Swiss-Prot record:
SUPFAM superfamilies: YajQ-like
Source organism of the structure: Bacillus cereus (strain ATCC 14579 / DSM 31 / CCUG 7414 / JCM 2152 / NBRC 15305 / NCIMB 9373 / NCTC 2599 / NRRL B-3711)
Alphabetized GO MF terms: nucleotide binding
Domain of life of the native organism: Bacteria
Name of the molecule in the record: Nucleotide-binding protein BC_1159
């Protein structure tokens, strides 16, 4: 009897890469002419990014700089969940962006439905914050990977432990 093959679908953000991107973005903000004298800042508090600036326009520019640096460091931007812009101390505005780690129940159901619609002989299991896909045929697993990649999910997914 042939051994089953499997892989895990996960959604992770590498925190050291996020820290590196923040440091590079802060250097650019300090050196840019249009940010001279502004109180623009980016901080990482556990898994929440806190963006601070003088006004909403500059806050959007800070966000654009940060996003460009995150993209260069291969950090998935889909996993950033931005909150509302709120007033902070000293005539500044603040916005929080939460880093989403893992696959929540709703997205796990969406992934499950995508795989079930393919009508292949594969089994899926939701394990905490990841989805395990098992099948006898590796070709079926490759088809599942292609389908999940092409699906329009609200989070970025990675495929690990391919056996």
């Amino acid at each position: 009897m042939a051994k089953d093959s499997s892989f895990d679908i996960v959604s992770k953000v590498e925190l050291p890469e996020v820290t590196n991107a923040i440091n590079i973005a802060l250097k650019e903000i300090q050196n840019r002419y249009d940010f001279k004298g502004s109180k623009s800042d980016i901080k990482l508090e556990k898994e929440v990014l806190v963006l601070t600036s003088d006004d909403e326009f500059k806050l959007e520019q800070v966000k654009d700089v940060l996003i460009s640096k995150l993209v260069k460091r291969n950090v998935p931007i889909k996993n950033l969940d931005y909150g509302k812009v709120e007033a902070a101390t000293g005539n500044t505005v603040r916005q929080r962006a939460t880093l989403q780690q893992g696959i929540d129940k709703d997205n796990a159901k969406k992934i499950n439905n995508i795989i079930k619609e393919m009508k292949l002989k594969v089994k899926t299991q939701v394990q905490d914050d990841q989805v395990r896909v098992t099948a006898k045929s590796r070709d079926d697993l490759q088809a599942v990977i292609a389908a999940v990649r092409s699906a329009d999910l609200p989070i970025d997914v990675q495929f690990i432990n391919y056996r």
